[in-house]
């Protein structure tokens, strides 16, 4: 199965790149001052992409245009539950004239996608979405649930993103394990459990 999945990833290379480019083209700039963010268009791109492979999802708006995306592949036992965690907002473009390539052009030069968010972290958002799609296409039997959550407002503290979701939809974020961009720190959950982030 491993070799088949790796071959499926290779076969989906162009699709992964195109999804990343589509996400980078969304100017989901988070200044930290409302109204800001514009994450809902990125969430809609994800929703359409996953729906094409029969994966249902939701966009939960914490405020107008502050879309928090979530999708799930159900496992046979439900647990352990693995969360893919990422965000679709980006930091502001301070001096567009200093950019070699347009910040929301998602142009490819020398094998790299250039644009705001191409490294933090729309590349990971695209990879997580496509990992879920490839697992679904391959018919991989999952024991536990796989949840893909791409949040708003990470670049400005998370009030309209994962913090909002944890307050209003905590059941959608429950998990046994999570894969995120961070790592190395001890964190304490609201219920008192502690965990180390591993990167």
Where are the model-predicted features located?
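Solvent-exposed, charged interface segments at domain starts and junctions
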Residues: 1-11, 177-180, 186-187
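Acidic/His- and Gly-rich active-site-bordering loop/insert found
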Residues: 2-116, 137-143
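Acidic/histidine-rich catalytic neighborhood of metal-dependent amide-processing enzymes
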Residues: 119-199
